[in-house]
């Protein structure tokens, strides 16, 4: 590959290895867990790299074919990453609430996208200014709502070749729609997620923005390599700044022993 592959040390610096509390785990994630510390699971970064490399090959091939991917991340930790990734690489994104039927009822979604295009065109050609003030307010309000829910996919004229989803558990509806249509799904799976619901799971922390950023950036770089694109550099942080943890956050003290999880046979 021509692009620079992310390393294990870089993943570690981004906090990719930090899983959820052991009591909140999904046993199907056992093959991807290194152990536990301070009552939190720790993800095996070697397994993360293996899965990431497979995902990179997939998105690289999609880029080489001139096709597009849809980034999905509606959680706070993912909103900026998926938007920046799509804008940098000419792909699509959803970072607000997933609209049911976005994929499975795409014809209806296209009609709503066209409504957004028409409003934008009326602004450009001056037709909107000819309407009454009341009508303009209502139309612009509709535009704002459409832009919020469809802005990231308003250039999507056909179904994407793949979905890249941050936290498939939170955006399970999007995952189910894609799987129903045989669209492959790459999912960043924390230790509380069922990895079987996606086509290609990548074990990774989905709460830290730095973790999400570095994983999404790695996939964008692979896509750009396949599509022969020169990307503008990402402005998002990929290194966790050490600070005092607030109550309820994952805490990994250095004086605790490591415990291996019970592995399943699955």
UniProtKB/Swiss-Prot annotation:
Keyword terms: Ribonucleoprotein, Ribosomal protein
Q: Which cysteines are joined by disulfide bonds?
A: none
Compositionally biased intervals (Polar residues)? 249-258
GO MF annotation: an example? structural constituent of ribosome
BP terms from Gene Ontology = translation
For the region Disordered, what residue ranges are annotated?
247-266
Q: Source organism's superkingdom? A: Bacteria
Q: Which Pfam families match?
A: Ribosomal_S2
Any one GO cellular component localisation term in the record? small ribosomal subunit
What InterPro entries does this protein map onto? Ribosomal_uS2, Ribosomal_uS2_bac/mit/plastid, Ribosomal_uS2_CS, Ribosomal_uS2_flav_dom_sf
The family this protein is said to belong to = Belongs to the universal ribosomal protein uS2 family.
Tell me what this protein is called: Small ribosomal subunit protein uS2
Species source reads Mesoplasma florum (strain ATCC 33453 / NBRC 100688 / NCTC 11704 / L1)
What gene does the UniProt entry assign to this protein? rpsB
């Amino acid at each position: 590959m021509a692009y620079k592959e992310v390393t294990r040390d870089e993943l570690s610096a981004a906090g990719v290895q930090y899983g959820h509390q052991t009591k909140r785990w999904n046993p199907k994630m056992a093959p991807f867990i290194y152990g536990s510390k301070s009552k939190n699971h720790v993800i095996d970064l070697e397994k993360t790299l293996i899965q990431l490399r497979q995902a990179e090959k997939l998105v690289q091939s999609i880029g080489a074919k001139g096709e597009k991917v849809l980034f999905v991340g509606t959680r706070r930790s993912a909103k900026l990453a998926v938007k920046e990734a799509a804008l940098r690489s000419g792909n699509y994104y959803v970072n607000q609430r997933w609209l049911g039927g976005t994929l499975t009822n795409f014809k209806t979604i296209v009609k709503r996208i066209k409504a957004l295009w028409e409003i934008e065109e009326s602004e450009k050609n001056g037709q909107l200014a000819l309407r009454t003030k009341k009508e303009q307010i209502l139309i612009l309000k509709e535009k704002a709502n459409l832009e919020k829910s469809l802005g990231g996919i308003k250039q999507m004229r056909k179904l994407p070749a793949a979905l890249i989803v941050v936290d498939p558990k939170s955006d399970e509806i999007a995952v189910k729609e894609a799987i129903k249509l045989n669209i492959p799904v790459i999912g960043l799976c924390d230790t509380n997620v069922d990895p079987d619901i996606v086509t290609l799971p990548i074990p990774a922390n989905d709460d830290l923005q730095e973790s999400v950023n570095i994983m999404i950036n790695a996939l964008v770089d692979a896509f750009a390599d396949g599509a022969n694109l020169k990307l503008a550099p990402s402005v998002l942080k990929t290194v966790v700044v050490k600070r005092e943890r607030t109550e309820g956050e994952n805490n990994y003290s250095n004086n605790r022993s490591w415990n291996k999880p019970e592995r399943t046979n699955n």
